[in-house]
């Protein structure tokens, strides 16, 4: 892309998992449900939808909206949590956001009119040399107007799992198990 510098850093690993809801059982996501997390342009559009979460492997509880500087042997990680609540009827909306919501951070409850669905979490790990981290020589976004802000981290998801598979995922999550 124009005004980009450097090259693409490929992930060392990617973990995709579904998580339950702290308050209620989850229902299966409908096929083709669309979800967004984060915002590609929070500098120009404002921070309301930004959800950047960065950490280092082995430091899961230390989350930041800044690029981390990890200790030697630890990987830089992007943690992307998608909404875990759904309006129960729409697989998309005009803004691609209002048909889904995040659970309340304090109570874990979905907003009124929403039901809990398996919450998708994607953890992307990168092997980035510590000296590169210390010099601030890695960046994420490719939008010049965002100044390579780590706060612009974002992702899109469309559920293409079969109905049968989503029923299995919901049952597994509701039973509190880790399922392959």
Go through the PLM ranges and name each one.
Residues 1-80, 87-180:
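Primary mode marks residue(s) on the alpha4-beta5-alpha5 output face of response regulator receiver
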């Amino acid at each position: 892309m124009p005004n980009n510098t450097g090259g693409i850093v490929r992930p060392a690993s990617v973990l995709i998992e579904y998580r339950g809801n702290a308050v209620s059982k989850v229902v299966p996501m409908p096929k083709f449900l669309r979800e967004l997390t984060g915002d590609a342009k929070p500098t120009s559009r404002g921070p309301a939808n930004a959800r950047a979460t960065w950490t280092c492997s082995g430091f899961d509880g230390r989350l930041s909206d800044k690029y981390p500087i990890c200790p030697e042997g630890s990987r830089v990680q992007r943690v992307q949590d998608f909404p875990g609540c759904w309006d129960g009827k729409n697989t998309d909306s005009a803004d691609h956001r209002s048909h889904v919501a995040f659970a309340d951070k304090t109570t874990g409850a979905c907003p009124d009119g929403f039901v809990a669905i398996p919450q998708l979490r994607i953890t992307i790990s990168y092997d980035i040399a510590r000296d590169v981290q210390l010099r601030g020589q890695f960046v994420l976004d490719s939008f010049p107007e965002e100044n390579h802000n780590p706060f612009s981290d974002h992702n899109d998801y469309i559920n293409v799992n079969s109905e049968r598979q989503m029923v299995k995922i919901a049952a597994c999550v509701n039973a509190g198990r880790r399922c392959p």
